[in-house]
Design a protein with these regions (language model features):
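Acidic, metal-coordinating catalytic segment for phosphate/diphosphate chemistry
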Residues: 52-97, 105
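Conserved hydrophobic/aromatic beta-strand scaffold that supports enzyme active sites
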Residues: 64-66, 92, 102, 173-175, ...
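Active-site segment of metal-dependent pyrophosphate-handling enzymes
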Residues: 54, 63, 86-87, 94-96, ...
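Nudix hydrolase/Nudix homology domain
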Residues: 42-48, 113, 120, 156, ...
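Short, low-complexity, charge-dense intrinsically disordered segments
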Residues: 4, 9-15, 29, 34
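Short hydrophobic transmembrane-like helices used for membrane targeting/insertion
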Residues: 1, 19-23
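Short, Lys/Arg-enriched N-terminal segments with co-localized hydrophobic residues
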Residues: 34-42
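Conserved Nudix-box catalytic region and its N-terminal flanking loop in Nudix hydrolases
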Residues: 44-47, 83-86, 90-138, 184, ...
């Protein structure tokens, strides 16, 4: 039997104990009350069929399950351990002179502070387009202290899957231009640790990518999308 990312590292019971021990032990009950049955159906379609699903852990941000699934290419059910996560937004803030605002943020799972675009989870998993755009503008204000200028525009750049081998997390890309400073400044969450926030030219971003100074997958992805659409030049100088 073939298993996904987590199951390759842990047997089911070990997985459950390790993950639940790191989070709120009452979270699964709270999650079930708020979102019962949502995650197990929303991504499946066509000839994909979930035969069974076992939940290992859930909180307000994620759920870990092992599903037995039939796929178009594999009619014999296979077991796969999946992390369901809320969708997210990733925003590229662009100033009038074409600079992109990046933040340098501490990330506990990797034990590093890295440069990245502002981003954040969408609270409502069933959000419509307006709610997703509102979340993008909120994250822009909270993390950078910038907002759209009066004549600014928020451009949707599509979406991507962050790591489809083990999670269904979907990220929505946006370009916000031009931006201006908010009078009240950033309004960051208590759990965030943003050490720096400043603008970079396209040449600087290109160099940072080439030198592996930008290592955040969300940021690399949105830079690729901007370059493909001719909105950001990443040609080496």
């Amino acid at each position: 039997m073939e298993y996904g990312f987590f199951a390759r590292e842990h047997a089911d019971q070990t997985l459950a104990s390790k993950i639940v021990g790191a989070f709120d032990p009452n979270a699964a009950t709270k999650f079930a009350a708020e979102d019962s049955g949502h995650y197990n159906c929303w991504m499946k379609g066509g000839d994909w069929k979930t035969i069974s699903s076992e939940r290992h852990f859930a909180d307000r941000n994620l759920e870990v399950v092992t599903d037995r699934v039939q796929t178009p290419a594999h009619p014999d059910p296979r077991a796969w351990t999946i992390v369901h996560r809320k969708p997210a937004v990733i925003v590229a803030p662009m100033t009038r002179d074409g600079k992109i605002i990046l933040i340098r943020q501490e990330r506990i799972p990797i034990g590093q502070a890295i440069w990245e675009m502002p981003s954040g989870q969408i609270d409502d998993r069933n959000s419509d387009e307006d709610k997703i755009q509102d979340t993008a503008l909120r994250e822009l204000r909270e993390e950078t202290g910038y907002e759209l200028a009066p004549n600014g525009e928020l451009i949707s750049l599509g979406y991507f899957f962050s790591s489809p081998g083990f999670t269904d997390e979907r990220g929505y890309f946006f370009l916000a231009r031009p931006i201006q400073s908010c009078t009240e400044g950033p309004d960051r969450d208590e759990g965030e640790s943003i050490l720096d926030c400043r603008g970079f030219s396209s040449e600087e971003i290109c160099r940072m990518i080439a030198d592996n100074e930008i290592r955040d997958a969300n940021t690399l992805g949105i830079c690729a999308m901007l370059a493909a659409r001719g909105l950001l030049s990443l040609a080496p100088r």
